[in-house]
Amino acid sequence: MAKVTVVGAGNVGATCANVLAHKDIVKEVVLLDIKGDMAKGKALDTWQQAPIDYYSTSVVGTDDYADTAGSDIVVITAGIPRRPGMSRDDLISTNAKIVKTVTENIVKHSDNPIIIVVSNPLDVMTLAAFEASGLDKSRVFGMAGILDTARYRAFLATALDVSPKEIQAVLMLSLIHISEPTRPY
């Protein structure tokens, strides 16, 4: 079974680590963040759910890249969040530096991992990770469509007062410039 590292213990990263653990499809999940105590706390919360939800995935939190050694898959969610009034393009310079540093540290400790970038703006961050990694292009890719589509379906479900399970929608955009519906439906 695989070892997966999730870099960034914010909402998206912590949720990713939690879901991976609950699915019980990997041996170990490492949740890494520059705020090591936060990563440790969220990882501990997830690990302590194991006896109740009956999974065996090990979950650890850290701020030390050495703990990511041997990762088969790395999910990068790290970056500054978008604040009100900011576009995703406003994040480019800062988040590109973060993603570059993260990627360089990851490849120092893991041989030929698959890197999945979630940080925004996704297209630019994926390129930054690819260039910093030195890996083959088949090893680095970005994932945004599922998350953005899920958010869109949730917005529509709320606006229409129905279950999100009843909404079928797919967004096919490189970037979404909305954070909430712009008008009621």
PLM region descriptions:
Residues I176-Y185:
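Single conserved hydrophobic/aromatic residue that forms the stacking wall/gate
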Residues L32-S71:
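Conserved N-terminal Rossmann-fold NAD(P) cofactor-binding segment
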Residues V74-V75:
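N-terminal Rossmann-like NAD(P) cofactor-binding module of classical short-chain dehydrogenase/reductase
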Residues G13-A14:
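N-terminal Rossmann-fold NAD(P) dinucleotide-binding loop
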Residues S87-R153:
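Rossmann-like NAD(P)(H) cofactor-binding subdomain of soluble oxidoreductases
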Residues A9-G10:
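Glycine-rich Rossmann-fold phosphate-binding loop(s) that bind the pyrophosphate
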Residues A78-I80:
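Conserved NAD(P)H cofactor-binding loop of Rossmann-fold oxidoreductase domains
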